[in-house]
Design a protein with these regions (language model features):
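Structural recognition of the beta-strand scaffold that forms the well-ordered cores
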Residues: 1-2, 64-66, 87-90, 136-137, ...
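Solvent-exposed loop/turn segments at secondary-structure junctions
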Residues: 5-8, 95-96, 142-144, 170-172
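Primarily recognizes the serine-hydrolase "nucleophile elbow" in alpha/beta-hydrolase
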Residues: 46-117, 142
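Short beta-strand/loop motif that positions the catalytic acidic residue
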Residues: 131, 137-139, 143
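Catalytic cores of secreted or luminal carbohydrate-active enzymes
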Residues: 148-177
Length: 177
């Protein structure tokens, strides 16, 4: 899943959706959902999974989803929606980002109805309770975005097999995750 709705050469896909830039995550909530980054990102992950499963080389009974940061956030949403995955690894991403973290001010600036609408549509807390796959959460104690308190609340939503790793002073990035 590309955060910018683009191809490997970074050019935009015709139906790639809006880019992940901050205004597209929070401030377009009053627009129709087809203008929302989260809507396109989740749909694109599920579409990509369907495509991969259609290949004869792929074992559709053993697919796994993992992504990092905003991708980990999306992994948490998709894990509750697409039950074909056999395992899920959410690195740095979790739910309840409206309760704590760097986006708190963004949510507080929203009207009550816009905030509630965003939570109902996109916060992983709305989906993790439906997760039917094994899920593994990976994070560090010093992550600036997905803080331990909301990480623990996300973990508690999972009814099935779950595990987590919380590494002391784990950096943020692809190599660390």
């Amino acid at each position: 899943m590309d955060l910018k709705g683009g191809k490997p050469d970074e050019s935009s896909l015709a139906d790639g959706g809006p880019q992940v830039e901050r205004p597209n995550i929070f401030h377009t909530i009053s627009a129709e959902k087809t203008k929302h980054w989260c809507y396109h990102a989740v749909a694109n992950v599920i579409r990509a999974h369907s495509l991969i499963c259609s290949f004869p080389e792929a074992d559709a009974d053993r697919t796994v989803i993992t992504e990092i940061s905003w991708g980990g956030f999306l992994t948490s949403v998709v894990s509750g929606l697409d039950h074909r995955f056999k395992a899920s690894v959410s690195v740095y991403g979790c739910s309840y980002i409206y309760k704590n973290g760097p986006w708190l001010a963004k949510f507080q600036a929203m009207s009550d109805s816009d905030r509630q609408h965003w939570i109902e549509l996109y916060d992983p807390s709305q989906y993790l309770g439906s997760c039917q796959t094994r899920i593994f959460f990976v994070n560090g104690t010093t992550d600036f975005a997905y803080l331990p308190d909301i990480y623990e609340q996300s973990y508690q939503l999972i009814k099935g097999e779950r595990n987590f790793q919380l590494t002391v002073e784990m950096g943020l990035g692809q190599p660390q995750g």
